[in-house]
């Protein structure tokens, strides 16, 4: 039976190291002797229910660890469920009862170290690179045991589309990239090409691939993985030369201006490209060469294949300028830098420089790397370390961190990001903080204090080592990461939300909270946020936006500002200014003023804001309005808030809720769910926008209707139903945040309960 271990310490202190005793670390372990017959039956039922309903509910409810925690804590929901009938008015007691039920359930899900565990996956291209890399390096069986393989296969079978392919994420239609790499993953894991025990998964996948032109229509990142495996030729790839890291700072795009995920990916990938590395051929590799192309492998024109991309994968068609750019880079990289004498004078030096960067970034993040995409696609880092020296400590340190990325759900094993521990904990604490009152019981008090302890121990207390600016790193001291302190790469909104929580605890009496956080650490957090504000008033996520944009560069290439991060930062800094007016008061006020203007300038014609990290316009509007309100704006004095409220009212469905499709993200316009269904996460966010916009004082009916949806959606145990996927990054790649169904629903109920009490 699989079990989740929290704060798992290193079994091998040589290759795994920590900055804070592994606080927040989440590791799944299989124990063949664990679990009673009843517990095992419960797990199997959850798996069976997901598989049977996978065509209707694509995202897992993340049940396995929840069942484990509820058993361990002997949780029993004793408060009866509230049901609001059609003609019935919601009373204050109804709302408070529903909130109380949800808080008791949510409290039981908190880990002993204070954070809330959760899956953070959802994207279908996360598993295969790990499998391919471990296969190439000969460590597949060591890392992925039989039990791991069973769950890997379960995940791929569960998320294969009806047409035989796989999409970019669990709700996505099939594309070439994910279909090819998942097909290869199945074959590496021992599934035969023509038949298997799951309705010929390989045969159906191969048919989809061949029907859509074959693997030469994979995008660049897919072609790179096929090249290192030896089932594609590097000459059919767009160039990723290691000499890129030599570009001076005055170039429009250089190592320092790249978006951090792209930088981490291209570090390892450019080394492999520059080395022209290809895995040792095996019988399976030779078979794959014949299975994923419609023509014989030896007949493929790699030059013609270089610019191919399936229409299903082509989110941003390449412009004429981009065509010229890539052709120029290819000529320079392959016809000049890769030939004598330049290959000795420049290429070898570039390879050494690239690996210096790889090692620096790996060490600075304790081999967790810069984020979900870098570690998953830039398993390239791990592979580059192995190519450099298969016996190196660098490679062994990467292997030691692989368990940090494994997550087990009822739908199988998925490689996730390194975790969303800090983000989930800060947002979860907001629920308890906003619902805080003087008669709080000991259970809620304990939840608050454990969460505070986790945040305090997870703050980044030092900048990266050495001359970090030279290595394309930036100030980190004072920030909070997305996950834990070991990862070491702070994010602005995670910092802002965590700082806001810490300011609440700072305002509490010592009798309630005990020892408080060092005030200097709060100052450090403020400094970090101030550092990230751009001239336009917006705030970036990881590093200042110093990219020099040109026509052919998408915003996925360089760092830029985000409305959600800006809104969160305004909330935290406005509260900080109230509690600590003596620290950088003018700078903080200037930040808020500029941030408000940035938010107002970014508002869409319909009154919404585009959400970069969640689905999508409702998500962005929630964080934008929250920031405006914290800055002193309200419905009466702010046109932007009035327009935002109108957008929310206009998109409310007949049930009284809201449901937004993930398609809003790539299409950049509001798209409701099919059938105008309700999603409780969107509904919670929209409900809070209405309350912040003083809708209760003008016409409370839309608010009551939304609250009724949330209250009636609550399940017998206090949980809320898992529905559509609600996280995203870079418009196309969806991420699964299953705890959102608890956070945003309960947070909304705290707002609603307070609003009822104030009537």
Curated annotation (Swiss-Prot):
Protein's UniProt name: Baruol synthase
Chain segments annotated as coiled-coil in the UniProt record: none
Keywords on record: Isomerase, Repeat
One GO CC annotation: lipid droplet
Role according to the record: Converts oxidosqualene to baruol (90%) and 22 minor products.
EC number, as in UniProt: 5.4.99.57
The keyword Repeat appears for this protein: yes
GO terms of biological process kind: tetracyclic triterpenoid biosynthetic process
Swiss-Prot/TrEMBL PFTB repeat ranges: 149-190, 522-564, 641-682
Pfam families for the chain: SQHop_cyclase_C, SQHop_cyclase_N
Reaction(s) catalysed (UniProt annotation): (S)-2,3-epoxysqualene = baruol
Alphabetical list of PROSITE patterns matching this protein: TERPENE_SYNTHASES (PS01074)
Active site: residue positions: 493
GO MF: baruol synthase activity
NCBIfam families: squalene_cyclas (TIGR01787)
Family per record: Belongs to the terpene cyclase/mutase family.
């Amino acid at each position: 039976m699989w079990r989740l271990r929290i704060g798992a310490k290193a079994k091998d202190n040589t290759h795994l190291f920590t900055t804070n005793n592994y606080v927040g670390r989440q590791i799944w372990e299989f124990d063949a002797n664990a679990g009673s017959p009843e517990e095992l039956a419960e797990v199997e039922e959850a798996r069976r229910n997901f598989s049977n309903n996978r065509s209707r509910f694509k995202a897992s409810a993340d049940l396995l660890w929840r069942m484990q925690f509820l058993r361990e804590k002997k949780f029993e929901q004793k408060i009866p469920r509230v049901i609001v009938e059609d003609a019935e008015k919601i009373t204050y007691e109804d709302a408070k009862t529903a909130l109380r039920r949800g808080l008791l359930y949510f409290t039981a899900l908190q880990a002993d170290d204070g954070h809330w565990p959760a899956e953070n996956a959802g994207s279908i291209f996360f598993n295969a690179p790990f499998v391919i890399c471990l296969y190439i390096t000969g460590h597949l069986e060591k890392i992925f045991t039989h039990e791991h393989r069973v769950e890997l296969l379960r995940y791929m079978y569960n998320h294969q589309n009806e047409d035989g392919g796989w999409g970019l994420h669990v709700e996505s239609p099939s594309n070439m990239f994910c279909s090819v790499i998942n097909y290869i993953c199945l074959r590496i894991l021992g599934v035969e090409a023509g038949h298997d025990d799951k309705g010929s998964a390989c045969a159906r996948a191969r048919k989809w691939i061949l029907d859509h032109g074959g693997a030469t229509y994979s995008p660049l990142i897919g072609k790179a993985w096929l090249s290192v495996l030896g089932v594609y030729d590097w000459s059919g790839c767009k160039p990723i030369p290691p000499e890129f890291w030599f570009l001076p700072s005055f170039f429009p795009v250089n190592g320092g201006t790249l978006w951090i995920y792209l930088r981490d990916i291209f570090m390892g990938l450019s080394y492999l490209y520059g080395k022209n590395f290809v895995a040792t051929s095996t019988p399976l590799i030779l078979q794959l060469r014949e299975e994923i192309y419609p023509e014989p492998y030896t007949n493929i024109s790699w030059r013609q294949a270089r610019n191919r991309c399936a229409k299903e994968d082509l989110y941003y068609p390449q412009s004429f300028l981009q065509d010229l750019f890539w052709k120029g880079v290819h000529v320079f990289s392959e016809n000049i830098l890769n030939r004598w004498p330049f290959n000795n004078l420049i290429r070898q030096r570039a390879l050494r420089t690239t690996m210096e960067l790889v090692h620096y970034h790996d060490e600075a993040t304790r081999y967790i790397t810069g984020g979900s995409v870098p570690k998953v696609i830039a398993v390239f880092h791990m592979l580059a370390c192995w190519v450099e020296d298969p016996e190196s400590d660098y490679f062994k340190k990467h292997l030691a961190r692989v368990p940090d990325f494994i997550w087990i759900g009822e739908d199988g094993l998925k490689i996730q990001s390194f975790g969303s521990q800090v983000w989930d904990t800060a947002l979860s604490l907001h629920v308890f903080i906003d619902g805080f009152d003087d008669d709080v019981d000991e259970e809620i008090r304990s939840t608050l204090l454990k969460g505070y302890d986790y945040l305090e121990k997870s703050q980044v207390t030092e900048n990266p080592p050495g001359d970090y600016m030279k290595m394309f790193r930036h100030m980190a001291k004072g920030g909070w990461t997305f996950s834990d302190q070991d990862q070491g790469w702070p994010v602005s909104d995670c910092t802002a939300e965590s700082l806001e929580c810490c300011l609440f605890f700072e305002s509490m009496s010592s009798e309630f909270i005990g020892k408080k956080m060092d005030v200097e650490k709060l100052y450090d957090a403020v400094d970090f946020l101030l550092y990230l504000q751009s001239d336009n008033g917006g705030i970036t996520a990881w590093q200042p936006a110093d990219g020099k944009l040109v026509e052919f560069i998408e915003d996925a290439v360089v760092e830029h500002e985000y409305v959600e991060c800006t809104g969160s930062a305004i909330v935290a800094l406005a509260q900080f200014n109230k509690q600590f007016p003596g620290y950088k008061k003018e700078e903080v006020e200037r930040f808020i003023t500029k941030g408000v203007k940035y938010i107002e300038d970014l508002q869409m014609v319909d009154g919404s804001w585009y959400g970069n990290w969640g689905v999508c316009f409702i998500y962005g509007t929630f964080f934008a309005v929250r920031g405006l309100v914290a800055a002193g704006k309200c419905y009466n004095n702010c046109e932007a808030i009035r327009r935002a409220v109108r957008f929310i009212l206009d998109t409310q469905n007949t049930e009284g809720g809201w449901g937004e499709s993930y398609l809003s993200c790539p299409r950049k316009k509001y798209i409701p769910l099919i059938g105008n269904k309700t999603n409780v996460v969107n509904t919670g966010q929209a409900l809070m926008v209405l309350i912040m916009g003083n809708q209760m004082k003008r016409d409370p009916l839309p608010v009551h209707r939304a609250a009724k949806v949330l209250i009636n959606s609550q399940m017998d145990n206090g949980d809320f139903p898992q529905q559509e996927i609600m996280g995203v990054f870079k418009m196309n790649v969806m991420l699964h945040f299953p705890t959102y169904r608890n956070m945003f629903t309960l947070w909304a109920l705290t707002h609603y309960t307070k609003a009822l009490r104030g009537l």
